[in-house]
Amino acid sequence: MPDAGMLEDFLAGACVDAAVFALRPDYRALLLAVDGLVPGPGDQDSDALLHAAETAARQALDGGPTEQVPHVAAWREAYRAFGAKPQRTRNSLEALLRRAASGLPRVNRLTDVYNAVSVLHQIPLGGEDLSRYSGAPRLVRAAGTEPFDTAADGIAVIEHPDPGEVVWCDDAGVTCRRWNWRQARRTQLREDTTAALFILDALDPVTDQELHAAAEDLAARLARLGPGVRTVRRMMAADPAPGERG
């Protein structure tokens, strides 16, 4: 199990490339590195949380189209900025909101908790197995040659991002394509995950306060998943111009 210093060192190496901030200067990433998690199937608490998220999603949509939710609309604009088609590749928040009407997926209590927090706070949120990382996480615009470990028709395949696509990666390859669309198989959460990385993505109109509130909620809920859970967090944002962001 990593100690708190190792978690801090891991996050200290994380970075967002200047080319990404040039694309969206309003982008912020809040990273949580967590260990001491006790794996387990979904339970009454995680199911109740998902039900609350489903209710919140229906209230947020209020019968209207998902793409009119302000943060979803902002992410659709960001996807178009690097050449993706948001009607074909949806950000993770939009994908969950669209599923909420018929019921959010029940996977395991760790995945269920972070999916519910994503919907409740309307913020894209990814979770990955920290122990399977090779080096620190980096958000970059892809060269197009980086390997991406995924599956097609149930068969493991290696794909590559489009040149200029915004991707999360580590030293071994892409960990998430199109900012927050699809995660790699290599680093995905597993039934035996005890250390995890969570990435919360924000664009305007989401405020820093709202982003931190989502992280606080997630951290509090994760703390219930084991007697020795430890969490370290780091916020990454573009350097504000004088007079901006306080």
Per-segment meaning from a language model:
Residues 2-246:
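Charge-biased, low-complexity intrinsically disordered regions
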